[in-house]
Amino acid sequence: MGRKRKHSETVTAAPVKDSAPERPQRTLLGWKDKKEDAENSKPAYASVFRNKEKVLVTCSRRINFRYRHLMLNMVSLLPHCKKDSKVEAKSSRGATLNELIELKGSSSCLFFECRKHKDLYMWMVKSPGGPSVKFLVNAVHTMEELKLTGNHLKGSRPLLTFSSNFENDAHWKLLKEMLTQIFGIPEGHRKSKPYHDHVFVFSIVDDHIWFRNYQISVPHNESDKIARGDLDKMTLIEVGPRFCLNPIKIFGGSFGGTTLYENPFYVSPNQIRALEKRNKAGKFAKKIKAKTRRKMHELSNPLEPDEFTDMWNDE
């Protein structure tokens, strides 16, 4: 019997694609190569700064209902914020809040602290390295109280405007930068809308920062198109809330540290209430002194007897 021949291994040919190669994109300057486009886009994309600002908003225990409503108004205006439960600890409040900020993945904090059910203090903090600012909040008017006609879409990004005197001193420049970072909503945030329809106004009057929120309104019909940049027809309608910030101290760290600035014109609410009590006590003392003076005057100047006083008594 003859030997069987060894069959050589059959090599399978690679399948030929019937479809034509994908056509490159055409531009005004010619055909666009995908490889060059990818290479050119990598360093440009890597150099783009992405704002990942997140703000933790919380308050202390035993806060007044008006101040709690103000905090909820701020939460509704800032879609990039995270609301947390009330903080109880007093002695270690700074350490507790710093830990909360780290757990929530936030970089800033707005802490509303209420004392004696009357006074509201607001901490504006950059964590973990600072700085931090402590304000006394006055002239609080919430959206529910004002009932203004302005209305803007929830989650839309605001335009931030500052008065010119923010550039006068160094501490005002620092406060302007902190307000810009905290109240400025990051572009492309998942809870924000990609356009502007309201304005946050920060103005300095009598060394106080006054906050206002206005809607940008453009009256038009459905058939009419809005001219781009037509500022003559645009009007501002106030939405709310309103409040006034009186800066007390600026610290170098988060919820403490070295004092960078202290307001020399600040007067605490306790001193104001004590002065009012003294004035009231002075009014009461003046009344008592007036009564004693009147009695002494009556004793020193008695009435002369009248000859007709007992005329009808004999009958």
Swiss-Prot record:
The keyword ATP-binding is annotated on this UniProt entry: no
A Gene Ontology molecular function term for this protein is:
rRNA binding
Start and end residues of each stretch annotated as Disordered: 1-35
Record's keyword annotation contains Transmembrane helix: no
Which InterPro entries does the entry mention? Brix, BRX1
Q: Where is the Brix domain?
A: 53-256
KO phenotype (gene knockout): Delayed growth rate.
- Coiled-coil portions: none
One Gene Ontology biological process: ribosomal large subunit assembly
Q: What induces it?
A: Induced by glucose.
Summary of the tissues where the protein is detected: Expressed in roots, rosette leaves, stems, flowers, siliques and seeds.
Q: Where in the cell is it found?
A: Nucleus, Nucleolus
Q: Which GO terms describe its cellular component?
A: nucleolus
Bias regions of kind Basic and acidic residues — which residues?
19-35
Q: Which UniProt keywords apply?
A: Nucleus, Ribosome biogenesis, rRNA processing
- Role: Involved in pre-rRNA processing and required for biogenesis of the large (60S) ribosomal subunit. Required for proper development.
Name the protein family. Belongs to the BRX1 family.
Name of the molecule in the record: Ribosome biogenesis protein BRX1 homolog 1
| Organism of derivation | Arabidopsis thaliana (Mouse-ear cress)
Question: In the record, what lineage is assigned to the organism producing the protein?
Answer: Eukaryota, Viridiplantae, Streptophyta, Embryophyta, Tracheophyta
Q: Which gene encodes it?
A: BRIX1-1
